[in-house]
């Protein structure tokens, strides 16, 4: 529905001895339809009302004395002053460059300027100023759940249960985001009883018509912190009161987007090589340290294996991609050969090896949690218009806390090996590729979706090779004829349906990663 209104706009044009008064009519259209959407990208700021302005000139009725002229309106400010926000540090942060400011966990800071989404200028209570990583702080509001130790924003149901079992205390609890946007779940550890084993209960925090939060309908509160405080002192509908908040805050430092703001080049003299931990498409990978206190993975790039100049330019862009489910790129060493790529270190190594080494030990909930982690990372890449091109279990890594992160996104564009680049080459990942890739070399987020379906299959077969008895040519023929991978025996039908939806012949028939994430999360919450 379109609402139209007519407004008279009067403007005054002054000269040295007279002014002319013009009246214009402007027709304003306001869309009241909730179904209409804005375009995703704007190439320029549009003003549709501009072309609808019509001038109605009026002649001067006489001279206006200079003393009676209306003053011109003041010029608008060149910049809108950004409101300063108070934040609280979630982690300690030691300065890495002279421009950095130290952070101490739980202390408050004032944000002065946001240089980019990942690095902000802040001031501490003593007046010291400097740059800090934005993912180390959170806005200091009583309604902001991130300031509380018991809140975990980005955690799956399985990861929550793993944390609570490690704590293994009656009443140990966390609060986490639920599968429904804007809703939350309390997960509580219940000790063993005479007739029951230890268990973990999950309680949905709901909202009533008055906007109050509750678990037990008789006890509703204006905010979630108030609700948690009440249930820390009263069970009131729960199996036990909330006794021990279980948190990660401060215990596991997240990676930062680069070692500092705009720092993409790393001095090789600042790196110490500890031991070789593997090898890949481009060369040997070492465990190392940067400036003797940050563990890193150092990839030495074999000369001639990569288009180095193109990659260096791309690395500057890749460093701006920062997400808890992506392996963080810290920078590159270009001062001498070979070129080094420095990334976040993941203690449990490659996901494919992790699955094979732990065969028979991983519960189905853990396998689904792996898929959920990867889907979260891929949804972030999709949202930012970035294509992986080689998504597979071999290109995902596992942290010390069993969080899975995506590695090597976009790297295949810089490979110079024809055996890997050509779809007819022996090293080309045909078994993870959709028809439009192996036939026309056409990549998109939807080709990544196909690969994600195959990766899910790898996870639920605990590391089997897809199409293990078929050659690349046979796989191409089978896929073209409509053949798809079978359902793994560890995968319930609900999981296989998600996998299968990724393998639609046409890209437009496949779901987005945002849709896949909702589906996987829904299954995880109902198991």
Curated annotation (Swiss-Prot):
Kindly give the membrane topology term recorded for this protein.
Peripheral membrane protein
Domain named SH2: which ranges?
Answer: 150-246
Sorted alphabetically, the Gene Ontology BP terms of this entry are: adaptive immune response; positive regulation of cytokine production; positive regulation of transcription by RNA polymerase II; positive regulation of type II interferon production; positive regulation of type II interferon-mediated signaling pathway; protein autophosphorylation; protein phosphorylation; regulation of gene expression
Indicate the segments forming the Protein kinase domain, all copies: 271-527
Q: Where is the motif named Nuclear localization signal mapped on this chain?
A: 68-73
Q: Which residues carry this modification: Phosphotyrosine?
A: 91, 420
Where composition is biased (Polar residues), the residues are: 51-64
Q: What is its EC number?
A: 2.7.10.2
Q: In which tissues is it expressed?
A: Expressed in T-cells and some myeloid cell lines. Expressed in Th1/Th0 cells with IFN-gamma-producing potential.
The SH3 domain sits at: 82-142
What is the main EC category here?
transferase
Catalytic activity entry: L-tyrosyl-[protein] + ATP = O-phospho-L-tyrosyl-[protein] + ADP + H(+)
Q: Write out the entry's keywords from A to Z.
A: Adaptive immunity, ATP-binding, Cell membrane, Cytoplasm, Immunity, Kinase, Lipoprotein, Membrane, Nucleotide-binding, Nucleus, Palmitate, Phosphoprotein, SH2 domain, SH3 domain, Transcription, Transcription regulation, Transferase, Tyrosine-protein kinase
Summarizing activity control, the record says: Activated by phosphorylation by FYN.
Q: Tell me the residue numbers annotated for binding ATP.
A: 277-285, 299
Localization of this protein: Cytoplasm; Nucleus; Cell membrane
What SMART domains has UniProt attached to this entry?
A: SH2 (SM00252), SH3 (SM00326), TyrKc (SM00219)
Primary site of residence:
cytoplasm
Spell out the SUPFAM superfamilies in the cross-references. Protein kinase-like (PK-like), SH2 domain, SH3-domain
Q: Where is this region: Disordered?
A: 35-79
Q: Tell me one GO molecular function of this protein.
A: non-membrane spanning protein tyrosine kinase activity
Subunit structure, briefly? Interacts with PARP1 and EEF1A1. Interacts with SH2D2A. Interacts with FYN.
The task this protein performs is described as: Non-receptor tyrosine kinase that plays a redundant role with ITK in regulation of the adaptive immune response. Regulates the development, function and differentiation of conventional T-cells and nonconventional NKT-cells. When antigen presenting cells (APC) activate T-cell receptor (TCR), a series of phosphorylation leads to the recruitment of TXK to the cell membrane, where it is phosphorylated at Tyr-420. Phosphorylation leads to TXK full activation.
**Family in the record:** Belongs to the protein kinase superfamily. Tyr protein kinase family. TEC subfamily.
- The protein's name in its UniProt record: Tyrosine-protein kinase TXK
């Amino acid at each position: 529905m379109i609402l139209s209104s007519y407004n008279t706009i009067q403007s005054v044009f002054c000269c040295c001895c007279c002014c002319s008064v013009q009246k214009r009519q402007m027709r304003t259209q306001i869309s009241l339809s909730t179904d209409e959407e804005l375009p995703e990208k704007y190439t320029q700021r549009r003003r549709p009302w501009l072309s609808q302005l019509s001038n109605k000139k009026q002649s001067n009725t006489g001279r206006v004395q200079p003393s009676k002229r209306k003053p011109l309106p003041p010029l608008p400010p060149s910049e809108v002053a950004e409101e300063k926000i108070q934040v609280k540090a979630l982690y300690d942060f030691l300065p890495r460059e002279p421009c950095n400011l130290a952070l101490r966990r739980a202390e408050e800071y004032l944000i002065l300027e946001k240089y980019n989404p990942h690095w902000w200028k802040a001031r501490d209570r003593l007046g010291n100023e400097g740059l800090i990583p934005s993912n180390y702080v959170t806005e200091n509001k009583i309604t902001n759940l991130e300031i509380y130790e018991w809140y975990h924003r980005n955690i799956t149901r399985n990861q929550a249960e793993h944390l609570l079992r490690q704590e293994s205390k009656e009443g140990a609890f966390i609060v986490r985001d639920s599968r429904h946007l804007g809703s939350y779940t309390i997960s509580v550890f219940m000790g063993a009883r005479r007739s029951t084993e230890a268990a973990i209960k999950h309680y949905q925090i709901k909202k009533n018509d008055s906007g109050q939060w509750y678990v037990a309908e008789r006890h509703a509160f204006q905010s979630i912190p108030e609700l948690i405080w009440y249930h820390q002192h009263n069970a009131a509908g729960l199996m036990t009161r909330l006794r021990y908040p279980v948190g990660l805050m401060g215990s596991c430092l997240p990676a930062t987007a680069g070692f500092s703001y705009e720092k993409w080049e790393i001095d090789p003299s600042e790196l110490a090589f500890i031991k070789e931990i593997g090898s890949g498409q481009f060369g040997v990978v070492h465990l190392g340290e940067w400036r003797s206190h940050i563990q890193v993975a150092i990839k030495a790039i074999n000369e001639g294996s990569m288009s180095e100049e193109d990659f260096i330019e791309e690395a500057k862009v890749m460093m701006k991609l920062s997400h808890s489910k992506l392996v963080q790129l810290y920078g590159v060493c270009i001062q001498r050969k070979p070129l080094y790529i420095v990334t976040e270190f993941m203690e449990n190594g490659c996901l494919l090896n992790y699955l094979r080494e732990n065969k028979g030990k991983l519960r189905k909930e853990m396998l689904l949690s792996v898929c959920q982690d990867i889907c979260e990372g891929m949804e972030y890449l999709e949202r930012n218009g970035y294509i992986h091109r080689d998504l597979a279990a071999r290109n995902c890594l596992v942290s010390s806390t069993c969080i899975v992160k995506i590695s090597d996104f976009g790297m295949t564009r810089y490979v110079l090996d024809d055996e890997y680049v050509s779809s007819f080459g022996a090293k080309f990942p045909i078994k993870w590729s959709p028809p439009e890739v192996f036939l026309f070399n056409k990549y998109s987020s939807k080709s990544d979706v196909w690969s994600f379906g195959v990766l899910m299959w790898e996870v639920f077969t605990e590391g089997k090779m897809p199409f293990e008895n078929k050659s690349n040519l046979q796989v191409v023929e089978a896929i073209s004829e409509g053949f798809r991978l079978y359902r793994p025996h560890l995968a319930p039908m609900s999981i296989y349906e998600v996998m299968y939806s990724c393998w639609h012949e046409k890209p437009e028939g496949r779901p987005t990663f945002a849709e896949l994430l909702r589906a996987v999360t829904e299954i995880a919450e109902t198991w």
